[in-house]
């Protein structure tokens, strides 16, 4: 195909071989492709004088001229005439070296992916008084026959700015004058010349919402962070610190007034409303359902397309930085859900990016997820591995987030996950472990903890895969923490039973301690447990209205007593009646009722108690911090445990009664003589409890009980958990 037709039909693979300034022995040639131009002059920008005119080639939009006198200009512009008048543009095709710079080091370090690819704002220092502001575009499309950058700056015309293909499958171009805020996409032709749906930038930093889904050029260097004090505070051992996580879907935590005409609160409005609430409630961390840009609201963010762009539903990238910054200035850590397991088929996204399987496994037995109707990343492909690890580092680097909760880890680890016998491909050893995904997760964790030792990674992993939260050098996956899905499943199953039947399920509340120290666990009552017909946490509880609330309070306090960091989804803390709906707000009006405000008050006090008493958090992941005092009283459905700090310096007993029967003069074995005091009783009237009488201070006597030399007699309220502090002799 002739060059003119290649350019006209956006089918030019190597424009640098034809356009721009090309030197010969004793001359230089300048060639331009400017659709709809009627004339072009070449302006030497060093002198701002014309050095000649380009001649149209055979009534085409291709213009060229050979210059046999003088030296080539260091940098030049075109004075273009067309039917509407004239304008000046700086020729993109003279900056070939600067364009190639994007891919010189991209494979060396994961961070280079977001520092070199995508739309990078650069200053071209070409000897002028002021550098030329430009944007360097670089995108990976190894099997495309042609790629053009299209956007506001060229009227979305794919014939205007063909990109240059490099030896490594990247396409590059520097475009002067493209600035922050300009919208763009890539027009890609597959290997056969067929035009694909216009693609958003895989490394785009900002994205528009439906219907355009366009990428937006963004400058990451403008925001001035104010969280230095926080960065100093977070140094330390995460395993011995209190961690109470409030899991939030930003789009439905609270909605604007219906008369505002807005669908969502903005990041700035969430700063004003969400942060004070979280701080007042005593949570240490926010965990946000996926922030990466996603097209479908109903996916809650778990079908992301723009991995490097915070969703613009609530504002721009700097607005999200401000949100994180303000969280830190208020002493709140920020964890984001991160989704490296799969991605959706949306036409503007990664699926068949250049007409081939660039990002996903080609074989559908590995590359298609039957549960979510989505594509699975090719975890064995170097460019994909770099892309994903880079994205993990990106959020820690550019947005200062404190941790990543990695979604759907089990689906990555197992080749036969949710597949029938004939629907999966064994690994090289004939097994079902995905070695490529395993090594990717190990690499990601090593990179995160190497560059950001104060950060944390948390795995949502629902199987018994070994050493998920153990270091890679010990043969583990390298995560900092793992969700304890077993505890969640067993304890919710138990608490949903009528109290009269709980005696037959007693082991469901104690079995978790058999494996409690195999991993570094987070106890999660997450969004997954209050959707899809499962009902709200309150509605899982049996009994009448009072018993449901009492069961929830008893269960919540048992969770805070149990070893492991804590996570609760929004709405749990007010005893929301309806299950979560992403299209509407939490039912905040329920706080007008004592039942719900009482539950909220309990969660607030549990967070305070958990943070203030080292016995309840310091040894969450050390067997020395826990002892069953009585875990065998199935007949009365009671449980008693001891939590203690390092060296036993502080001792807190937790006693739970999972029946509606009050237990007067209930005897509890204790370690030492002396005085004990009630720290918290979930049956107190302030929590909408019955206010069952209870002495605040109790003396131990030398009555052996529960294999202890001493014991105390307490009044154990119905459906309640009581925390008791040993004060000393």
Swiss-Prot record:
Active site per database record: 407 (nucleophile), 460 (proton donor)
Gene Ontology biological process terms from the UniProt entry: glycogen biosynthetic process
Pathway note: Glycan biosynthesis; glycogen biosynthesis
InterPro entries: A-amylase/branching_C (IPR006048), Branching_enzy (IPR037439), GlgB (IPR006407), GlgB_N (IPR054169), GlgB_N_E_set_prok (IPR044143), Glyco_hydro_13_cat_dom (IPR006047), Glyco_hydro_13_N (IPR004193), Glyco_hydro_b (IPR013780)
Keywords: Carbohydrate metabolism, Glycogen biosynthesis, Glycogen metabolism, Glycosyltransferase, Transferase
GO cellular component: cytosol
Domain of life: Bacteria
Keyword Iron-sulfur: no
Subunit and partners: Monomer.
HAMAP family: GlgB
UniProt similarity note: Belongs to the glycosyl hydrolase 13 family. GlgB subfamily.
Name assigned to this protein: 1,4-alpha-glucan branching enzyme GlgB
Species the sequence originates in: Pseudoalteromonas atlantica (strain T6c / ATCC BAA-1087)
Organism taxonomic ancestry: Bacteria, Pseudomonadati, Pseudomonadota, Gammaproteobacteria, Alteromonadales
């Amino acid at each position: 195909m002739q060059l003119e037709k290649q350019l006209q039909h956006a089918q030019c693979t190597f424009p640098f071989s034809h356009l721009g300034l090309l030197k010969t022995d004793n001359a230089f040639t300048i060639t331009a492709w400017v659709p709809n131009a009627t004339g072009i002059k070449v302006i030497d920008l060093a002198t701002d004088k014309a050095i000649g005119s380009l001649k149209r080639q055979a009534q085409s939009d291709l213009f060229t001229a050979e210059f046999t006198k003088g030296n080539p200009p260091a940098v030049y512009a075109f004075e273009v005439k067309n039917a509407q008048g004239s304008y000046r543009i700086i020729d993109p095709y003279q900056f070939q070296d600067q364009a190639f710079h994007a891919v010189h080091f991209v494979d060396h370090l994961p961070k280079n992916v977001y520092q070199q690819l995508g739309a990078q704002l650069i200053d071209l220092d070409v000897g002028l008084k002021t550098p030329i502001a430009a944007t360097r575009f670089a995108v990976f499309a190894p099997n495309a026959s042609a790629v053009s950058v299209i956007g506001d700056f060229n009227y979305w015309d794919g014939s205007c700015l063909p990109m240059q293909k490099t030896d490594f499958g990247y396409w590059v171009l520097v475009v002067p004058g493209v600035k922050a805020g300009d919208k763009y996409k890539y027009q890609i032709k597959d290997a056969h010349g067929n035009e694909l749906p216009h693609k958003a930038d895989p490394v785009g930093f900002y994205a528009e919402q439906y219907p355009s889904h366009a990428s937006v050029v963004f400058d990451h260097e403008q925001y001035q962070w104010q969280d230095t004090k926080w960065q100093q505070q977070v140094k330390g051992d995460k395993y011995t610190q209190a961690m109470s996580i409030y899991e939030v879907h930003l789009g439905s935590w609270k909605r604007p007034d219906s008369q505002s005409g807005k669908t969502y609160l903005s990041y700035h409005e969430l700063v004003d409303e969400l942060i004070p609430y979280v701080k007042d409630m005593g949570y240490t961390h926010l965990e946000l359902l996926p922030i990466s840009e996603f097209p479908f609201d109903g996916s809650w963010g778990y079908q992301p397309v723009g991995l490097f762009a915070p969703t613009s539903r609530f504002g721009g990238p700097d607005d999200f930085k401000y949100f994180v910054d303000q969280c830190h200035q208020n002493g709140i850590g920020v964890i984001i859900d991160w989704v490296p397991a799969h991605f959706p088929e949306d036409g503007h996204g990664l699926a068949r990016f250049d007409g081939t399987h660039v990002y996903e496994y080609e074989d559908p037995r590995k590359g298609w997820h039957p549960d979510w109707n989505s594509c699975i990343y090719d975890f064995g492909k170097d460019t994909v591995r770099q892309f994903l690890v880079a994205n993990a580092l990106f959020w820690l680097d550019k947005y200062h987030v404190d941790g990543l909760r990695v979604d759907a880890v089990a689906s990555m680890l197992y080749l036969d996950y949710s597949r029938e016998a004939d629907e999966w491909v064994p690994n090289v050893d004939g097994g079902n472990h995905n070695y490529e995904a395993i090594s990717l997760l190990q690499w990601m964790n090593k990179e995160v903890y190497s560059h950001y030792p104060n950060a944390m990674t948390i795995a949502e992993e629902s199987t018994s895969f070994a050493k998920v939260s153990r270091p890679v050098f010990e043969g583990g996956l390298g995560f900092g923490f793992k969700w304890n899905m077993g505890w969640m499943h067993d304890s919710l199953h138990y608490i949903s039973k009528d109290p009269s039947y709980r005696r037959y399920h007693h082991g469901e509340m104690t079995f978790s301690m058999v494996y409690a120290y195999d991993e570094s666990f987070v106890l999660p009552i997450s969004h997954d447990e209050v959707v899809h017909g499962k009902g709200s946490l309150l509605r899982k509880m049996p009994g009448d209205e009072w018993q449901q609330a009492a069961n929830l309070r008893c269960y919540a306090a048992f969770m805070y007593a149990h070893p492991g960091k804590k996570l609760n989804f929004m709405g749990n803390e007010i005893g929301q009646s309806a299950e979560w709906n992403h299209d509407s707000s939490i039912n905040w009006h329920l706080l007008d009722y004592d039942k719900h405000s009482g539950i909220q008050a309990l969660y607030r006090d549990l967070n305070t108690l958990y943070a203030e008493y080292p016995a309840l958090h310091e040894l969450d992941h050390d067997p020395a911090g826990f002892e069953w005092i009585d875990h065998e009283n199935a007949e009365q459905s009671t449980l008693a445990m001891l939590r203690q700090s390092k060296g036993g310096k502080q001792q807190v007993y937790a006693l739970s009664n999972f029946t509606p029967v009050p237990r007067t003069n209930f005897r509890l074995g204790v370690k030492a003589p002396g005085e004990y005091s009630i720290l918290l009783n979930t049956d107190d009237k302030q929590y909408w409890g019955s206010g069952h009488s209870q002495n605040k201070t109790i003396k131990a006597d030398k009555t052996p009980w529960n294999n202890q030399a001493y014991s105390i007699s307490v009044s154990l309220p119905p459906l309640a958990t009581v925390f008791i502090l040993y004060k000393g002799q």
